[in-house]
């Protein structure tokens, strides 16, 4: 049942968020029942908004772990290089608006309210999932904000994820592990096949960590799509030894993935100086609002927050 504001008055921000949570199935709240296979709703929403994702360049990131760290770091570096950057990630920790940012600033409450109020007569009959609706909101917002480039994080899997309507400059798959096996498959090769669905024709793909069970999956898909492929864990990068703000040994793998991504973007004509990389690497949280990556909340007693899973 859809929530309406009392007396048909304009909804507040909190009422709007409650409406979204109640009306659009959300994976974090109800689990597998929220998952909708297929891109029909996404395409319908995108067409309704005149394909906003075609108005800016895109970097598309999938993987079991490390998507958030890689997404925020690349956004930080590109912002430091002078680009206006959209950032779409999930889930949020505190406020829904964390999911959609431009140059580190969350989408405004007023925009969220306006989007829902103006467009719900169209999307209610579609019964979109929470993530389908959020993705449509992000793409439209980035187009209206005239971002230069957007970092788009996959929600679940890749092949059938609603972000997979994009044609990016660069695709990244951070790693493969067992997660969401009820949707993606029960072997690493099956999961890799789903995530390899983001590999686009003639578009470079970076694999952060490869495994014997998954390497051939990625390699074969890249060959079939005529897409240059880089296995980041097999080749050193000239930026991987730069100082990095995010702590934890596991971040070393992300750094190499990010470094190769930067090199690929530079080769495509993105203007990214070493100074921008150094600043971006050491000011990720300040620049993008990233939280929960081995984040020390207090010293005495030590209290650390990390969202790793």
Regions found by a protein language model. Name each.
Residues 2-63, 70, 76, 80-81:
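Short functional linear segments
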Residues 30-39, 44-55, 80-166, 184, ...:
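ATP-dependent carboxylate-amine ligase catalytic core
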Residues 74, 138, 218:
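Aromatic/hydrophobic pocket-lining residues that form π-stacking "cages" and hydrophobic walls in ligand
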Residues 74-79, 142, 265:
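Hydrophobic alpha-helical packing residues
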Residues 85, 205, 228-230:
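Hydrophobic beta-strand scaffold residues
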Residues 149-154, 162-172, 177-180, 190, ...:
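Nucleotide phosphate-binding/pyrophosphate-handling subdomain across enzymes
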Residues 158-160, 167-226:
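Conserved catalytic-core segment of NTP-binding enzymes
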